[in-house]
């Protein structure tokens, strides 16, 4: 009995550092996430429309937005594995304010929104780089985030789209009262 207790204690002591993890400083020369900040309101935020729905349907962006979301633009089909539970435009049914965000050295129009019937759990963030050639989006679906990228020079993967979108979202949260998304209907 005593021997099994000692083995268990030893196993706990050996596994605790592994399961707790450790913080390792970044390697010299590596960079962290890009710095993002919300810019003062100006007319650039409204160049493609005054609301999320106007931006999604703007003639200059319409085809790019549909290409950005691909198959997720349309309503899901039964048995569609890996698809969203709603069509991408529904994540912007209730749109928040359009804002300008600077990430690193680029300015983006930031459009937030949520699904009318599930505003707390179905949220969207769309970034349109100034000039409209690069688009990135994050659709949050009850704990899962789906990232989309479109345009020349837009990079996916761990150092790309997800990191840029997360930086933008943090900046928008700091500039608002904690959540840049529309509030659920009462």
Language-model segments: what does each one mean?
Residues 2, 28-29:
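Intrinsically disordered, low-complexity segments
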Residues 12-16:
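Alpha-helical transmembrane segments
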Residues 29-51:
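Post-signal peptide N-terminal segment of mature Sec-exported envelope proteins
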Residues 71-138:
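Mature extracytoplasmic domains of secretory-pathway proteins
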């Amino acid at each position: 009995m005593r021997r099994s207790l000692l083995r268990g204690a030893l196993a706990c002591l050996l596994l605790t550092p592994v399961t707790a993890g450790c913080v390792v400083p970044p390697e010299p020369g590596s960079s962290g996430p890009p710095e993002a900040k919300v810019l003062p309101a100006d007319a650039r935020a409204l160049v493609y429309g005054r609301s999320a729905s106007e931006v999604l349907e703007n003639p200059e962006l319409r085809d790019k937005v549909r290409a950005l979301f691909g198959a997720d633009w349309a309503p899901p089909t039964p048995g569609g594995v890996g698809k969203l539970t709603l069509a991408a435009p529904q994540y912007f049914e209730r749109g928040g304010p359009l804002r300008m965000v600077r990430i690193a050295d680029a300015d983006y129009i930031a459009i937030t929104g949520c699904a009318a019937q599930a505003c707390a759990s179905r949220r969207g963030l769309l970034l349109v780089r100034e000039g409209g050639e690069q688009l990135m989006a994050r659709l949050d679906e009850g704990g899962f985030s789906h990232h989309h990228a479109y345009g020349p020079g837009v990079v996916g993967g761990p150092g790309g789209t997800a990191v840029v979108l997360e930086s933008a979202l943090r900046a928008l949260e700091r500039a608002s009262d904690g959540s840049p998304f529309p509030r659920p209907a009462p």
